[in-house]
C-alpha cells in the first residue's frame, strides 16, 4: 500500500524541498494533507490534468456559497471549498511526479487553476465583506471593487514576469524563476500573499470574527504594494 512517506520520497527532491519550505503554511500544513489526499488517486486512471480541472469545482462552489448564502455558516463552508482547492492544487503535482507523467501542458493547466484561485478568493472576500463587516462605514460596492482589484494585483505581476522570462531571456530574467533567489523580504511577502499559504488562515479568522472588511482592505493595500515592488524588480 502506498504511504505518505512513499509519495513524499518520490515527489519532493532536496532542491524542491528547500524552495517549498519558504512558504511555511503550505509546506507544513497544506503539503502533508495533499499527500494524504493523493493516495486515493494513485491507483486510478485519473490524470494530473484532470485533477487540476477538478480543483476548479470547489472554487466555483465556494464563490457560489459566498454569493448565495450570506451567513457565517455559508462563508465557513465557502472557506472549506477554497481549502479543498488548496489540497487538490498539491495533488495534481504529486500525482504527476509520483507517476512520472509531468508535462508542459500540465504546468499550464496548474497555473490556470492557481490564477483562478487567486482572483476568486480575494473577490469572494470582497463579496463576503459587503454582507458582513466589522465597520459600517464601508460602502458594499467599495468592498466588492477592492476585493476584485486585490485579486488582480496578485495576478498582474506574475503575467508580466512570465512575459519577461520568455521574451527577454537574459540571465537576470531567468533568475526571476522560482524561489531559490528569494531574500527575507520576498519570503515574508510570499508567506503573506501566496493564496495557498497564510492568506487562507487569515481568511478563516476574518470570517469567524466578522472582519471580512478588514481582510479585504488590508489585502488590497498589501497586494497593491507587493505588485508595485514586484513590477519594479521585473522592469528595472
Where are these regions (language model features)?
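Membrane-interface starts of transmembrane alpha-helices
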Residues: 47, 51, 73-74, 106, ...
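Short, contiguous, helix-prone interaction/anchoring segments in small proteins
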Residues: 32-52
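A feature for the membrane-embedded catalytic helix bundles of lipid/isoprenoid biosynthetic enzymes
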Residues: 2-38, 111-236
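Alpha-helical transmembrane segments of multipass membrane proteins
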Residues: 39-40, 60-67, 201-205
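Membrane-embedded alpha-helical segments that form the functional core of polytopic membrane enzymes
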Residues: 48-105, 122
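Membrane-interface alpha-helices at helix entry/exit sites of multi-pass transporters
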Residues: 104-112
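A generic hydrophobic-helix recognition signal that picks specific residues
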Residues: 40, 82-85, 103, 147, ...
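C-terminal ends of transmembrane helices
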Residues: 39-40, 93-98, 231-232
Amino acid at each position: 500500500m502506498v504511504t505518505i512517506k512513499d509519495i513524499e520520497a518520490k515527489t519532493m527532491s532536496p532542491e524542491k524541498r528547500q524552495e517549498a519550505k519558504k512558504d511555511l503554511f503550505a509546506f507544513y500544513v497544506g503539503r502533508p494533507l495533499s499527500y494524504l489526499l493523493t493516495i486515493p488517486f494513485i491507483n486510478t486512471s485519473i490524470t494530473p490534468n484532470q485533477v487540476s480541472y477538478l480543483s476548479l469545482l470547489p472554487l466555483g462552489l465556494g464563490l457560489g456559497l459566498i454569493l448565495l448564502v450570506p451567513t457565517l455558516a455559508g462563508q465557513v463552508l465557502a472557506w472549506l471549498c477554497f481549502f479543498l482547492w488548496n489540497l487538490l492544487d498539491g495533488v495534481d503535482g504529486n500525482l504527476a511526479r509520483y507517476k512520472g507523467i509531468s508535462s508542459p501542458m500540465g504546468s499550464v493547466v496548474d497555473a490556470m487553476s492557481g490564477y483562478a484561485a487567486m482572483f476568486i478568493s480575494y473577490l469572494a472576500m470582497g463579496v463576503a465583506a459587503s454582507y458582513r463587516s466589522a465597520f459600517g462605514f464601508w460602502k458594499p460596492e467599495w468592498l466588492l471593487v477592492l476585493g476584485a482589484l486585490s485579486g488582480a494585483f496578485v495576478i498582474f505581476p506574475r503575467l508580466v514576469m512570465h512575459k519577461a522570462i520568455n521574451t527577454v531571456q537574459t540571465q537576470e530574467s531567468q533568475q526571476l524563476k522560482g524561489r531559490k533567489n528569494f531574500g527575507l523580504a520576498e519570503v515574508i511577502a510570499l508567506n503573506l500573499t501566496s493564496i495557498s499559504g497564510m492568506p487562507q488562515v487569515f481568511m478563516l479568522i476574518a470570517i469567524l470574527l466578522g472582519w471580512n472588511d478588514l481582510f479585504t482592505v488590508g489585502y488590497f493595500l498589501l497586494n497593491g504594494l507587493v505588485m508595485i515592488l514586484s513590477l519594479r524588480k521585473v522592469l528595472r
